[in-house]
């Protein structure tokens, strides 16, 4: 009898592992936050360079950041979102702009 129970326990463990492995990854919103100093052209550049938007869509998002205080640049897995936030913030600092990029769970 012990063997049967062991197999049932093993089957349950495998089933639990598969269920966990098949869960979609957590997603995160990458957000640009408005400030009074970063030029609009720089924000457009960031949106094109790091999020691959064309100039028209980048301009629309830049205006959303400007008038609404922030805008979602995209929704990504945790690792991708963290990397994009880090790269945008580093690029802004290298260019001496206070532009802030953050993330939050979607």
UniProtKB/Swiss-Prot annotation:
Per its UniProt record, what Pfam families does this chain match?
ClpS (PF02617)
> Could you tell me the Gene Ontology terms of the biological process aspect for this record?
protein catabolic process; proteolysis
InterPro entries for this protein: ClpS, ClpS_core, Ribosomal_bL12_C/ClpS-like
Domain of life, per lineage: Bacteria
Looking up PANTHER family in the UniProt record yields:
ATP-DEPENDENT CLP PROTEASE ADAPTER PROTEIN CLPS, ATP-DEPENDENT CLP PROTEASE ADAPTER PROTEIN CLPS1, CHLOROPLASTIC
Subunit structure, interactors included: Binds to the N-terminal domain of the chaperone ClpA.
As for what it does, the entry says:
Involved in the modulation of the specificity of the ClpAP-mediated ATP-dependent protein degradation.
Family of the protein in this entry: Belongs to the ClpS family.
Q: What is this protein called?
A: ATP-dependent Clp protease adapter protein ClpS
Q: What is the lineage of its organism?
A: Bacteria, Pseudomonadati, Pseudomonadota, Gammaproteobacteria, Enterobacterales
């Amino acid at each position: 009898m012990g063997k049967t129970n062991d197999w049932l326990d093993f089957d349950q463990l495998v089933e639990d592992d598969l269920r966990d492995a098949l869960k979609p990854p957590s997603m995160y919103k990458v957000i640009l936050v408005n400030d009074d100093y970063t030029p609009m052209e720089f924000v457009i550049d960031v949106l094109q360079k790091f999020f691959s938007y064309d100039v028209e869509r980048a301009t629309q998002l830049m205006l959303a950041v400007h008038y609404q205080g922030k805008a979602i640049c995209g929704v990504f897995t945790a690792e991708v979102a963290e990397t994009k936030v880090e790269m945008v913030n580093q690029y802004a600092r290298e260019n001496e702009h206070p532009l802030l990029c953050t993330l939050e769970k979607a």
